[in-house]
Amino acid sequence: MSDSEKPASLDADLSRRLYRALTADRDGILSVLNDPSMEVLRSLLKNPNLDEPILLTLLKRMDLTEDTLTAVSRLPLAGESHQVKVALVHHPATPARIVQTLLPHLYLFELVTVCFLPGVTPDQKVAAERAIIQRLPVTPLGNKITLARRATSDVVDALLQEGNPQLMDACLDNPRIRESSLFRFLNGPTATAETISTIARHSRWKNRPNLKLAILKNGRTPQIWFTVFLPTLPLVEVKNLRASGRLTKGQKECVEEELKRRGVR
């Protein structure tokens, strides 16, 4: 074949594939799904025999382009099918603007899955986290406990700041929770004697110097923790606690007793 004949042959082949994609019956569509041409696949999207299972199979292809995925998102089927919405969100090449519009349609734990998808972009992760956090006020306690165990650090932080004692153990056991979240909680308005004690006795957190000090500087901390923690502090920190204006009378007495034990007046 001469060079002049090759383009005509290629054009004819592409035309046949485009026509087949547009007109094939359901069985014929299956043979089109692996076509390397995005143009052919976009033609397939106009086929009246296209259904949800076929579209979901197509969305498993990781080589789909943004243009092709945008075309999928505009299909009536994408608006009707929850599974297609999920598949679009999961696809790494789906444009961020489309993902943003689809996230509100996902269920709570589908959003959690999005946060941990391989290749998820920072913007997509943040958007999923925000969608989860926005739903927390109406989320049942049982689901919150599961979230506290499984979710990302930002979601766990939001749950922790609620101050619900029933969420504390799950939050504290989450491997992604940050010490800074606990520090903020201990210095915030929702910390109570019960929740402070939960942190103070937790094996992972009870020996963190910054958290110890935050616990001892909180006026709601039970005095038992002064008895436990004060002997472990450097003298200068104990003196600083004596000067604190945040402690209760009973807490200050514990500090004075510790200083007296160390021979400091």
Please identify what each model-predicted range represents.
Residues M1-R265:
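Alpha-helical scaffold segments
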